[in-house]
Amino acid sequence: MPLRAPLPRTVSLFHNETLDSFLGRLAAANHLPADQLLPLLEIRRTKKTPINTLLEPLAAAAGVTRTALELALPEFLDTDAPDKPGTIGRPRATLRTAIQRPACRRCTHAAGIALPVTCWTTHDRNVCLCHRLWIGDGITNADEQVDISRIPDTVRAQRHHRNLMTRHGRRWVRSAYPEARKIYFTWLESSADPFELLNTARRLLTDGAGKAPARDLTLAMVFHPQVVALTGLLAGREWERRAVATGHVTWLIEQITLRGILLGYVPKERQDPLIQWVEQHFSLHKFAAFHRSRRIYDAFFPRETIPPSRHHEEVSTETRWSPFHPYYRC
């Protein structure tokens, strides 16, 4: 018979933790190899196994209610039932581009959890504002998280990023952010560092044990404010309207310097990453507008969190008018 009583030792739930992370912690607490926990509970897990079949027996073994476990682990959330309390705004674990990262180590310690925790997260959660730790791009384990108290502009950029999603909509900011990173770091690769800013930043971010962050991680942290500013520019509609009306992107290019993203920026050739992105961006919109399909927009611009039901989003920033004929809200 399957075990229906809690295991001798249980572990605390952690918000948005991945199922594998939770199973690993529960197994470790009971001195079991991770791959032996589910067989002990007589739970068979394969790629074709519906995830919710694990919910009831796992909740019993963990000594928590079914509802508590369901709300803690996004894999158990039903994305087709967005009006269920606690689901709206949670990471979509089934998304192909869903992000898993280590939780802030100081947050887990504050929760009384000693073992590492991996969470489903969203593109904007790069800084833990409570503890001023970099927890985003470039972090693969909790020990790599860097205290960024000495670079307050990066902390402010986290708040700016959050404000951008309120202004433009999470869907569009999320779509622009990875492209902004790619564009900006391509620019950096072709520029010199005459003042050795990178080495100075690495020395500034060296921890108490004398360990400096890796070069790529330092770049991600130091230039995060510029990446966020570029994200806001690309996610906005002003440049799009001006480009459609005039047939050129002069205004967009001027804003790169005016907003302090890259001083003196002038694209020298059509292969410039920003120009290539603009062409690709308009091609996607023209393709979607021609087919006039919401599914195509959902494929090109997926929602990374569970959205509210359709009737709640009539005037939401998550939907937009197509910039090309035939005009319709997508």
Stretch-by-stretch model annotation:
Residues 1-330:
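Basic, alpha-helical nucleic-acid-binding regions used in initiation and control of genome expression
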